[in-house]
């Protein structure tokens, strides 16, 4: 395997654990990245400890101001204008995945992954978000707006 490093969006939850196991079984060296969106020190500590228990490097990046501006303010504004906001979709396409890609680039890591349940299919030279194999856990709706350059970096979909 030529480039076997991957940066994993890592909350420390069960899906993050599953992603680590799947990636390692496929021969990848995993580095975990936890994004600090709300200043939840208990969540950050849990992620750090769990990454340590798995024996993988752990990094954290604060995106609090960006999250407040791009997700919380958007949600509030949309709600008060009588619109139906989609904060999770917006967070994934504007914060989580772009930050994961930028951090991977800064570290010289070519691949990114998360524990989200979805698949990527290719057609006509492009990659598309499609439903997960398990419809009960499918999260493709929250990821529909991921740009092509992010999909091109993405390795794994549970």
Question: For each of these PLM feature ranges, what is it?
Answer:
Residues 1-145:
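ATP-dependent adenylation/nucleotidyltransferase module used to activate substrates
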Residues 144-154:
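Acidic/polar active-site rim loop that often engages polyanionic ligands
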Residues 156-158:
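Conserved small/polar residues in nucleotide/adenosyl-binding loops
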